[in-house]
Amino acid sequence: MSRTPSSLDKDKGSSEFVENMNEIEIIEHTRVPSDKPSGFGGHLIDENLVKVEGEDKVTPYLCFLISASAIAGFLFGYDTGVVGVALPLVGTDLGGSVLSSSQQEIITAGTTIGAIFGSAILGGWGDRLGRKVAILIADVFFTVGAVLIAASYSVPQMIVGRIVLGVGVGGAAAIAPLFITETAPTAVRGRCIGVNAFFIPFGQVISEAIGAGVQDMKNGWRLLFALGAVPSLFQLILFHYLPESPRILILRGQTDRARHVFSRIYPNATPEMIDYKFRVAQEYVTATTVLQSGTTYWQRTKTLFTKGSYRRSIVTVSLIQMAGQLSGFNTLLYYAGTLFSLLGLTNPALGGLIPAGTNAFFVLVGMTLVDKVGRRGLLMFGVPIMLAGLVWNIVAFHYLCIPTGGLLDTSYKYDTKLVGIVIGGIVFFTTGFGLTYSHLAWYQSEFLALEVRSVGSGIATTANWVANLVVSVSYLTELETLTPSGTYGLYLGFSVVFFIFAVFCYPETKQLSIDETSLLFEEDWGVKRSREMRRERRETQRRLADSEMTEVATAHVQAQKQKDSAVTRSELDNFMEELKNGAKRFPISR
């Protein structure tokens, strides 16, 4: 579909390069939804048609912005890892008796319960509060919760502290990826979201490492939980120097501040380019405001499940979130100390570093590949590795536990070789998980339309925590009733079902702008539509490049005519061929 020049293109303040682009027939995907007000003319402008020099590079300012935001991911990861190494150290400090399996499960699940509320409330109110304020509120809950846990002298007090902490974990998990998605340039958006995803296993590694070092320290578990308040206080300070999301600033009418944020994100852009980036975002926000006008938060939530395109998008991101949890990976962290004690390791906390470190490394690998290979490409490659790892675990645990009736027994010394095979299966499984769900689950904001992005992100993150709750409160019980092999067989069944769903219903978002990706679900689940949109985008870029070549060739011919009027058509064709052969010298963007 060719794009009709919009009022923005005709604006007197628009630069010459925008006007020139209107002379080219451009395939355009980005349109206001079909139920939009008629005043929008049926289309919106594609931000990617104008690319700034160095846009595919991570600038120092963008690095600061993304890193400060990703502390939320670190806090998420630290809490996930710390409970697994801290609970075995509690001993009789909470009520005078050793924690039972059910008490460990309830304490572990406390954060998950709080996170369900945090992601639903802070995530859902992200538009009204703003991304920045929502993250700051989450930091307050983080800090208060960490203090309550570290000062606990009873199981109920610790559970309350874990719930308070969980509100912060859930809220930050919903908002931080959303904030990053809305501020990062499309060319590096995958890597930027990946930083937040990487900080999750990085936090897990740090908690496991510190836990290994305080095994013999009195009240070491209190220190472990108290240290969780340090990153949240640090983020509170850093966010004082960070801007609000430019789209939220536009929504509030703070246009000068929004332009300033764009100029910081794109330091090499000309004023005209900044104006173009700003006006594109402004059109989307204006369209969204009209779509949201007259509706309440609960009405928009209902719309997510009644309108087909919204429903398909929220189902996709929610199921991908749940897939990561129901694979069982977090049980390796929540109960690392218990599991590796059962396997006979003398320092179980060091054993916890195995899945945490492997996950962190392969999240980093996936983060570097995601903008090249694509989200779907990584999923199709990595999940089969994860499934093979689960099969490995099923078989390995079966043979390991034959002497103890199929169950793990701390009083029995298992064969060292078989323990090594089990750990090898855990590493192989974690490799696939790190490449896929560990970070791809947090790309949820890419799939959601702006008008429901905040509430949708909150719902998807809530789905994550509900699945997390199911796993965390049942793992130790499952080991005792289903046996370790049966437990990982259950996780394998879940993972196979979710992978089949992903094959048919998880579209690629690579190369598409944040405001284009939500259009993938307009007609179906978007897998085929994504391929078509990305192919047409490549053709559009090629035509833009050819147009620049033509302009250069014409200027060359005119210069030659001044010297010699005998320039032939064949000479022009030869010159054009030379340009095409050396097209790298003529960038697509202006």
From Swiss-Prot:
Top-level taxon in the UniProt lineage: Eukaryota
Topology feature Extracellular, residues: 87-105, 154-162, 214-222, 347-349, 398-417, 476-485
Compartments it resides in: Cell membrane
GO terms for cellular component: plasma membrane
Upregulation: Induced during sexual reproduction. Expressed during infection.
Transmembrane residue ranges: 64-86, 106-126, 133-153, 163-183, 193-213, 223-243, 326-346, 350-370, 377-397, 418-438, 455-475, 486-506
Entries under SUPFAM superfamilies matching the protein: MFS general substrate transporter (SSF103473)
Disruption phenotype: Simultaneous disruption of ITR1A results in defective mating hyphae, reduces production of phosphatidylinositol and glucuronoxylomannan, reduces laccase activity, and increases expression of ITR1, ITR2, ITR3, ITR3A, ITR3B, ITR5 and ITR6. Simultaneous disruption of ITR1A impairs the ability of the fungi to traverse the blood-brain barrier and leads to attenuated virulence in a murine inhalation model of systemic infection, and the brain infection models by tail vein or intracerebral injection.
Keyword Transcription regulation attached: no
Topology, Cytoplasmic side: 1-63, 127-132, 184-192, 244-325, 371-376, 439-454, 507-590
Keywords carried by this UniProt record: Cell membrane, Membrane, Transmembrane, Transmembrane helix, Transport
An example Gene Ontology biological process: myo-inositol import across plasma membrane
Topology versus the membrane: Multi-pass membrane protein
Pfam families recorded: Sugar_tr (PF00083)
Keyword Glycosyltransferase: no
Gene Ontology molecular function terms on file: myo-inositol:proton symporter activity
Reactions mediated catalytically: myo-inositol(out) + H(+)(out) = myo-inositol(in) + H(+)(in)
Cited function: Major transporter for myo-inositol. Plays a role in the traversal of the host blood-brain barrier.
Cited NCBIfam families: SP
Family to which this protein belongs: Belongs to the major facilitator superfamily. Sugar transporter (TC 2.A.1.1) family.
Name under which the protein is recorded: Myo-inositol transporter 3C
Organism: Cryptococcus neoformans var. grubii serotype A (strain H99 / ATCC 208821 / CBS 10515 / FGSC 9487)
Lineage of the organism: Eukaryota, Fungi, Dikarya, Basidiomycota, Agaricomycotina
